[in-house]
Amino acid sequence: MIEADRLIAASGRDREEVQDRAIRPLRLDEYIGQPVVREQMALFIQAARGRNESLDHTLIFGPPGLGKTTLANIIAQEMGVSVKSTSGPILERPGDLAAMLTNLEPHDVLFIDEIHRLSPVVEEVLYPAMEDFQLDIMIGEGPAARSIKLDLPPFTLVGATTRAGMLTNPLRDRFGIVQRLEFYSDKDLATIVSRSANILGLVIEDQGAYEIARRARGTPRIANRLLRRVRDYAEVRGKGQITKAVADLALNLLDVDERGFDHSDRRLLLTMIEKFDGGPVGVDNLAAAISEERHTIEDVLEPYLIQQGYIMRTPRGRVVTRHAYLHFGLNVPGRLGEGADFSEAGDE
């Protein structure tokens, strides 16, 4: 199974990137949710503009689909400068990074997505650029090689990552501002869905927006994707209006249940319950039982189920919690009662 194949995948798709540009907020006052991040960034941006300086280098991290790219573009808009965008895997050689840095205007924003995937040799070039606004370039080869320094205009590097722990300490320490994006509340997601529907010219009721929001796994990207699919259903079977009933019918047809689980999520949970008595079960045994790769379970299926409290990792393997039994209307085993002891829970 490929993550991008799932309707509820948090990772982006090329076609969606184009579609999302039309509904992406451009200013902080249009940015919904993340109140602490929004207030802090408004303060930092106002201060930097008041001093006529570049904003400090900013690291944005959090799960995929929460708006890291959107926030980077908003920073550039609020600073009144241009943004140049790239990603860690694309910058294969120092020359690739040097070409982008030398084309920046004063105070511009350089946005690097998946910054944790920068190669070490490229990262070394980035250090003096971030710290001293200088670029060290080697001219020539062998004994005749020499290093020259090029001055760069002051700029703001905005790095985005889903895996902040994979950043090297020297790179992490060079960011003056670090922001973590959290999963969104259903209320904020419903506001995002209503806003997107309005931009797309759709008729949507508040309850219809909330029905989509509560199945979107706390992620705006998923909420907007579900909105587009519910729109298709509404146009064909619902007279073009998205009500709670229409959203419910559409999402049930799309196999996204009231908790935002799809077939793959439910199959994993039911396999653990029915074949392994709720666990503990090792991830390799679980992978064999559902015919999936180990990394698919660890990287694609498990994170949301763990975050929602349906699965726990213990020293002896994975176990389902009482919430999984309740979700399927099954009797909760006595060992998983209200006073169940998970004191030994941890990473397998």
From Swiss-Prot:
Residues annotated to bind ATP: I23, R24, G65, K68, T69, T70, E131, D132, F133, R174, Y184, R221
Entry keyword set: ATP-binding, Cytoplasm, DNA damage, DNA recombination, DNA repair, DNA-binding, Hydrolase, Nucleotide-binding
Region (Head domain (RuvB-H)): 258-348
Top-level EC class as recorded in UniProt: hydrolase
Molecular-function annotations in GO: ATP binding; ATP hydrolysis activity; four-way junction DNA binding; four-way junction helicase activity
Superkingdom assignment: Bacteria
InterPro entries: AAA+_ATPase, AAA_lid_4, DNA_helicase_Holl-junc_RuvB, P-loop_NTPase, RuvB-like_N, RuvB_C, WH-like_DNA-bd_sf, WH_DNA-bd_sf
EC number per UniProt: 3.6.4.-
GO cellular component, one term: cytoplasm
Pfam families with a match to the protein in the record: AAA_lid_4, RuvB_C, RuvB_N
Annotated GO biological process: DNA recombination; DNA repair
Sequence segments annotated as region (Large ATPase domain (RuvB-L)): 4-184
Residues reported in the UniProt entry to bind DNA: R294, R313, R318
Localization of this protein: Cytoplasm
Segments for region (Small ATPAse domain (RuvB-S)): 185-255
Residues noted as binding Mg(2+) in the record, renumbered to the chain: T69
Catalysis: reaction(s): ATP + H2O = ADP + phosphate + H(+)
Role this protein plays: The RuvA-RuvB-RuvC complex processes Holliday junction (HJ) DNA during genetic recombination and DNA repair, while the RuvA-RuvB complex plays an important role in the rescue of blocked DNA replication forks via replication fork reversal (RFR). RuvA specifically binds to HJ cruciform DNA, conferring on it an open structure. The RuvB hexamer acts as an ATP-dependent pump, pulling dsDNA into and through the RuvAB complex. RuvB forms 2 homohexamers on either side of HJ DNA bound by 1 or 2 RuvA tetramers; 4 subunits per hexamer contact DNA at a time.
Family: Belongs to the RuvB family.
Domain notes: Has 3 domains, the large (RuvB-L) and small ATPase (RuvB-S) domains and the C-terminal head (RuvB-H) domain. The head domain binds DNA, while the ATPase domains jointly bind ATP, ADP or are empty depending on the state of the subunit in the translocation cycle. During a single DNA translocation step the structure of each domain remains the same, but their relative positions change.
Quaternary organization: Homohexamer. Forms an RuvA(8)-RuvB(12)-Holliday junction (HJ) complex. HJ DNA is sandwiched between 2 RuvA tetramers; dsDNA enters through RuvA and exits via RuvB. An RuvB hexamer assembles on each DNA strand where it exits the tetramer. Each RuvB hexamer is contacted by two RuvA subunits (via domain III) on 2 adjacent RuvB subunits; this complex drives branch migration. In the full resolvosome a probable DNA-RuvA(4)-RuvB(12)-RuvC(2) complex forms which resolves the HJ.
Protein name, UniProt field: Holliday junction branch migration complex subunit RuvB
Organism this protein belongs to: Pseudomonas putida (strain W619)
Name of the encoding gene: ruvB
